[in-house]
């Protein structure tokens, strides 16, 4: 290996160790279950995105197997070549019916959706206004686009309006936000964002990754709770979280989607999703609309878990969903807390910069519809006990 490169990479890795930001891969089995196996130890799973417990659902498995047997294991090409199976059009029609939109585009992941949609729609001549706590894929899409990037304080609508008011009237404007923020568990003020985008002639993109399948009518997303869906220009959502599958979608007015499938590089220059994945996705979309009980259980479990941790004195920020952080400050605190929790049989992972701002390292808990109150109480008792021993109330 080239010695200059070796020295450079070793130096960068050493810096990560010194900042306690080095990350390891841990062998995990049965992550689709309420109890998983991590490093050969059985733990209560409070770390996954399998919010409705569908990743292990037999109906999804059977749908995936049936489509794999019929169409094979791979798409064989990009969608614009010969990879556009009829399954794609079926899934996209289902998304439009579910979301009440004109047209949809299925893509390979939430990350490729966000970097693709933003970098396709705007360029160095435009401005993007982005919440400070938006997902990294949104930030990367803005960087890739070359557009002017204006970050407003988290959920700070006054700051956003000030930025919109002072922006050049010559430039096209795009506002983008998560609906449920993945590391904080709070939600965007969608009604006010719609008002601002209309007032200042912007378009609005929302990332429903952690809301799709859970909130709104039939689990269509947070934007459907307040009947705002038709006023939002483009919705992005994933199949990899509440729907228990893989992939993502973009949906909105037909002209947006037509433009994206012609211009979005992360869609054009990649092989399509496997047919088995699409079969599972189609079944998952059907299930989440019909199975109200799973969604109700998830929301109730989130309320229970949040209230108990808040009452115990933990800093859980403004979480109002199934994602519940305990903010502990330093990287060292988060790593120590995570280690003790895993030793006690709780799969809970330390989240550190650059994923979250400096000095806001945390344990990110994610409850699911499949957890019982007994599971959560068992975990809460251990969380409180360990935090007291380690003096980790912040």
UniProtKB/Swiss-Prot annotation:
GO process annotations (BP): biotin biosynthetic process
Pathway terms, separated by semicolons: Cofactor biosynthesis; biotin biosynthesis
Binding site for pyridoxal 5'-phosphate: 110-111, 182, 207-210, 238-241
InterPro entries per UniProt: Aminotrans_II_pyridoxalP_BS, Aminotransferase_I/II_large, AON_synthase_class-II, AONS_Archaea/Proteobacteria, PyrdxlP-dep_Trfase, PyrdxlP-dep_Trfase_major, PyrdxlP-dep_Trfase_small
The entry's keywords: Biotin biosynthesis, Pyridoxal phosphate, Transferase
Modification N6-(pyridoxal phosphate)lysine occurs at: 241
E.C. number(s) listed in UniProt: 2.3.1.47
Cofactor(s) the record lists: pyridoxal 5'-phosphate
Catalytic activity, as annotated: 6-carboxyhexanoyl-[ACP] + L-alanine + H(+) = (8S)-8-amino-7-oxononanoate + holo-[ACP] + CO2
Binding site for substrate: 23, 135, 355
GO MF entry, a single one: 8-amino-7-oxononanoate synthase activity
Classification via PANTHER family: 8-AMINO-7-OXONONANOATE SYNTHASE (PTHR13693:SF100), CLASS II AMINOTRANSFERASE/8-AMINO-7-OXONONANOATE SYNTHASE (PTHR13693)
Family stated for the protein in its record: Belongs to the class-II pyridoxal-phosphate-dependent aminotransferase family. BioF subfamily.
Subunit structure: Homodimer.
Function, in words: Catalyzes the decarboxylative condensation of pimeloyl-[acyl-carrier protein] and L-alanine to produce 8-amino-7-oxononanoate (AON), [acyl-carrier protein], and carbon dioxide.
Protein name per the record: Putative 8-amino-7-oxononanoate synthase
Organism: Bacillus cereus (strain AH187)
Gene name tied to this protein: bioF
């Amino acid at each position: 290996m080239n010695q200059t490169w070796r020295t450079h990479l070793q130096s960068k890795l050493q810096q990560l160790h010194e900042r306690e930001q080095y990350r390891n891969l841990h062998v995990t089995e049965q992550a689709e279950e309420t109890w998983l196996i991590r490093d050969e130890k059985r733990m209560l799973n409070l770390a996954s995105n399998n919010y409705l417990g569908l990743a292990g659902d037999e109906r999804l498995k059977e749908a995936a197997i049936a489509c794999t047997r019929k169409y094979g294991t791979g798409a064989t090409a990009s969608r614009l070549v010969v990879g556009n199976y009829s399954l794609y059009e079926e899934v996209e029609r289902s998304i439009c019916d579910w979301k009440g939109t004109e047209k949809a585009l299925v893509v390979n992941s939430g990350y490729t959706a966000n970097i693709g949609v933003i970098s396709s729609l705007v360029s160095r001549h435009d401005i993007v206004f982005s919440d400070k706590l938006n997902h990294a894929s949104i930030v990367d899409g803005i960087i890739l686009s070359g557009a002017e990037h204006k970050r407003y304080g988290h959920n700070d609508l006054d700051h956003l309006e000030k930025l919109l008011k002072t922006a050049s009237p010559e430039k096209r404007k795009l506002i983008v936000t998560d609906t449920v923020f993945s590391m904080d568990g709070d939600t965007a003020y969608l009604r006010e964002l719609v008002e601002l985008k209309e007032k200042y002639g912007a378009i609005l993109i929302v990332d429903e990754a952690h809301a799709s399948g859970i909130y709104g009518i039939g689990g269509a997303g947070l934007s459907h709770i307040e009947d705002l869906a038709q006023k939002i220009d483009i919705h992005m959502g994933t199949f990899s979280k509440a729907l228990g599958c893989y992939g993502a979608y973009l949906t909105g007015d037909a002209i947006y989607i037509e433009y994206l499938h012609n211009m979005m590089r992360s869609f054009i220059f990649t092989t399509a999703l496997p047919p088995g994945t699409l079969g599972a996705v189609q079944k998952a979309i059907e299930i989440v609309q019909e199975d109200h009980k799973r969604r109700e259980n998830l929301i109730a479990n989130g309320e229970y878990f949040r209230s108990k941790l808040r009452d115990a004195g933990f800093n859980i920020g403004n979480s109002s969903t199934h994602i519940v952080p305990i903010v502990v400050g330093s990287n060292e605190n988060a790593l120590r807390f995570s280690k003790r929790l895993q030793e006690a049989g709780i799969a809970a992972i330390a989240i550190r910069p650059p994923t979250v701002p400096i000095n806001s390292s945390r344990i990110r808990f994610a409850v699911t519809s499949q957890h019982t109150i007994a599971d959560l109480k068992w975990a809460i008792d251990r969380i409180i006990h360990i935090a007291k021993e380690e003096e980790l109330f912040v």
